Design a protein with these regions (language model features):
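Gly/Ser/Thr-enriched, mixed-charge loops and adjacent short helices
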Residues: 109-231
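An N-terminal, well-structured beta->alpha segment
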Residues: 1-64, 68-69, 95, 149-172
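Glycine-rich phosphate-binding loop
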Residues: 93-102, 108, 228-250, 255, ...
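Phosphate-binding and adjacent anionic-ligand microenvironments
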Residues: 273-390
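N-terminal small/polar loop signature for handling phosphorylated ligands or for N-terminal nucleophile
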Residues: 39, 44-109, 189-249
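General beta-strand structural signal in soluble alpha/beta enzymes
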Residues: 9, 47, 73-77, 98-99, ...
Length: 390
């Protein structure tokens, strides 16, 4: 079939729903992915979708196509991307597809493909799938796969509570799902904790009417900053559209960059872990590097690709990692996938064991001056050419 190949990205598929990403494309993807799985003797795949426009339609076409190739589908419905990652591990099913465009504009949708070791499909697998999408000669298998509908959210929220060990400190937190997919689960999770919680923008709405759910853009954090001050909260947390990232606001209503937050977490993690390696990306500040070295840690420098970071952490047995984009990974008492809600809870766990507020803790770190991330607008076609040239 013909389609705009610019939707095929380094780690996932994303484009405008209705023009670049259509239900017919989901059908083709399901046929190709299912047929590829048959060639490597994989029998089952987990499928979920976030709250974006078109998610239900894309999922239906995807699932129908997968089963028509003989693949069994465990369909978990409306979930965050981390819940799909969780479900795959609980079920022992490595391969999965999440219908999402993450933090892209509200008009977009797409697909994240997961494979070996429950991680994003690597370059070699994606190349096979991407090439096959437009290859009429690619063999499409036929069969009669089954569909099992599974509710996994309750078990996910239960596991969240079990994984967090709180101290005696009582805390107030403001949580902003940004009308994204975290809206469907975050209250259920926080009901299991003794926190005083204020929720804002907590109704699922794929048009994102209050602000875009991308915590890496400080303008999107203004409502949260104001709410933290208004409610005298200890912490503010915001998630992106599919909740694999978390943004942070301190008790003074100031946004904390992800690398600075990681610097706070390092000491706590490295003091109890025999593994002292921490993965950071090239955009992280010297504040984080200083803290890792002060804790006698080892720095593993990586690219800003969260999919690659997750694989590198697994392959090199790295205990903690992340980058400036707010993707953060724990592998001390967590499987290591990026989960914004879990990251926020780990920060609260840390705070619950100290009398210091977040601002005072930040003052103990070395300070360096830097510019905010600068992004230059260009077309997808030009963007990829520029990156290749560099």
């Amino acid at each position: 079939m013909k389609f705009d190949k610019s939707i095929l990205r380094e780690a996932d598929i994303r484009g405008v729903y209705g023009t670049q990403i259509k239900p017919a494309f989901a059908t083709r993807l399901g046929l190709v992915f299912g047929s590829y799985l048959k060639t490597i003797n994989v029998k089952t795949v987990v499928v979920g979708h976030d709250n974006r426009i078109g998610g239900v339609e894309l999922s239906k076409n995807l699932v129908d196509a997968l089963t028509s190739t003989g693949i069994d589908v465990i369909f978990i419905g409306l979930v965050t991307t981390p819940i799909l990652n969780f479900a795959s591990r609980e079920l022992g099913v490595e391969y999965g597809i999440m219908v999402t465009a993450s933090h892209n504009p509200a008009c977009d949708n797409g697909f994240k493909l997961f494979g070996k070791n429950y991680q994003h499909c690597d370059y070699d697998e994606l190349k096979i799938i991407y090439d096959a999408l437009s290859n009429r000669e690619y063999k499409i298998y036929t069969g009669k796969g089954t569909i099992k509908n599974l509710e996994i959210n309750d078990l996910y929220s239960k596991r969240m509570r079990e994984s967090i060990s709180l101290g005696n400190r009582k805390m107030k937190v403001v949580v902003d799902p940004g009308n994204g997919t975290a809206s469907i689960i975050v209250k259920k999770i926080y009901n299991r904790f003794p926190f005083d919680v204020v929720f804002i923008n907590d109704v699922s709405d794929p048009t994102f009417p209050n602000h875009h759910p991308d915590p890496n853009v400080k303008a999107n954090m203004k409502q949260l900053c104001d709410a933290v001050i208004e409610h005298s909260a200890d912490l503010g947390l915001a998630y992106d559209g599919d909740a694999d990232r978390c943004g942070f606001v301190d008790n003074n209503g100031e946004v904390i960059d992800a690398d600075i937050l990681m610097a706070l977490m390092c000491k706590n993690i490295l003091k109890t872990s025999e593994n002292k390696t921490v993965l950071i990306d090239v955009k992280c500040s010297n504040t984080l590097r200083d803290e890792i070295l002060a804790c006698k840690g080892i720095i593993y420098l990586d690219t800003p690709s969260s999919a690659k970071q997750e694989r590198d952490m697994e392959e090199n047995n790295i205990v903690f990692g992340g980058g400036y984009s707010n993707h953060i990974f724990f592998r001390d008492k967590h499987p290591g996938y990026d989960d914004g809600i879990y990251v926020g809870l780990r920060v609260q766990e840390l705070l619950s064991h100290t009398k210091l507020n977040l601002t005072d803790m930040l003052k103990k770190l070395n300070t360096y001056y830097h510019t905010d991330e600068i992004k230059v607008k260009t077309t997808d076609e030009l963007k990829f050419k520029i990156v290749d040239a560099i």
